[in-house]
Amino acid sequence: MKIFRCCFKYTLQQKLFILLLTLWLFSLLKLLNVGRLLFPQRDIYLVEYSLSTSPFVRNRFPESGDAARDNVNCSGVYEHEPLEIGKSLEIRRRSIIDLEDGDVVAMTSDCDVYQTLRQYHEKLVSREEEDFPIAYSLVVHKDAIMVERLIRAIYNQHNLYCIHYDLKSPDTFKAAMNNLAKCFPNIFIASKLETVEYAHISRLQADWNCLSDLLKSSVQWKYVINLCGQDFPLKSNFELVTELKSLQGRNMLETVRPPSAKTERFTYHHELRQVPYDYMKLPVKTNVSKGAPPHNIQVFVGSAYFVLSRAFVKYIFNSSLVEDFFAWSKDTYSPDEHFWATLIRIPGIPGGISSSSQDVSDLQSKTRLVKWFYYEGFLYPNCTGSHLRSVCIYGAAELRWLLNEGHWFANKFDSKVDPILMKCLAEKLEEQQRKLIALSSEKFMTEGTRQSHTL
């Protein structure tokens, strides 16, 4: 027994010595910067190269002489030129580094510098757009740089923007959103913020809070559109105004009769519970049946996304029927996916459609273009990016399809999946805005000349 204890003690001493020696060697290698030689990292790609190598961000990278090789011709991507598509695919194989929330906080800390960096002063606007302001409700919770790019893409000084961030979002994300709001008189943070849980009434409440604030603004916006941080526009502001005018007061959203698979979402009581996967908390179905909807309302389903007229929004904030239906929906699963789709069918509501009218599918509604895995190759081409919960995160090869499909916005985008697509989309939309405003100005000048000749 004595010999065993001695050997055991000696073995422990050996293990401790080897552990300390290993730690010392790793520290030495790190100090001498030998790690890159022994464990070479993948080549990196900086999504925002000029900013990431500037003093305006928190995590600054050294400049690289190889930056020029990363230039991708967006017209070539649009035309599916093999060389440009190949470049985008090569970039995706690298370690993609985008700006972190702290970087967005840093670059928005000085509003004048930020607006110059992002060239807000170069945004063009027509008289038609000035006379047709649009309101936006942005419900966001992560990736400040994605939200910043979205706002920059849809920003016009005559529009109005409400940002609702999740109360459980990281503090740096909240700081970035607060900084963005401080830099513009027409961007603000919702006066009431929610802790948003997936498929819970809190998601609907977040949009509701923004709608309430937007109505109180002095800006007489014509339509309101809700977006999330993974959305991006497919139309320039000029095009969007033209499309909205053509609605002539009607609303635009998905509204279909519920398939049997979805009826349990609102016929049974759901409770918010802890779950052992992604969302942490989720409304879980119980065995308790719900009563019928108030006022004999017929339930329709759709998506959380809408394009609503000002008259519609004013109506719902002054309707006891809508108030009762909102309360009834609180213990359902994903109420935002039936609430708006149902309201638009209520008789007499501004811009609504009859409950007997045909279904309006997600492809017929132009509010959001989403590519579902199980419809790929049937309703639309295959995804060239990746998938998250059966939804396509688009790749650069889908640029042309996205722009030509006819929708106004699309979901999902992720710069760390494909950074080239969002760059090319932004570039194409800016080109379209400049082109249409130039044509509009020529038309205005021509009409003015005709009137002067008439006089």
From Swiss-Prot:
Residues 1-13 are cytoplasmic. Keywords: Disulfide bond, Glycoprotein, Glycosyltransferase, Golgi apparatus, Membrane, Signal-anchor, Transferase, Transmembrane, Transmembrane helix. It is a single-pass type II membrane protein. Disulfide bonds join 74-228, 162-383, 183-210, 392-424. Pathway: Protein modification; protein glycosylation. Its EC number is 2.4.1.102. Glycans are attached at residues 73, 287, 382. InterPro entries: Glyco_trans_14. The keyword Ubl conjugation does not apply. Residues 35-455 are lumenal. The keyword Hydrolase does not apply. Signal peptide: none annotated. Pfam families: Branch. Glycosyltransferase that mediates core 2 O-glycan branching, an important step in mucin-type biosynthesis. Does not have core 4 O-glycan or I-branching enzyme activity. Belongs to the glycosyltransferase 14 family. This is Beta-1,3-galactosyl-O-glycosyl-glycoprotein beta-1,6-N-acetylglucosaminyltransferase 4. It comes from Mus musculus (Mouse).
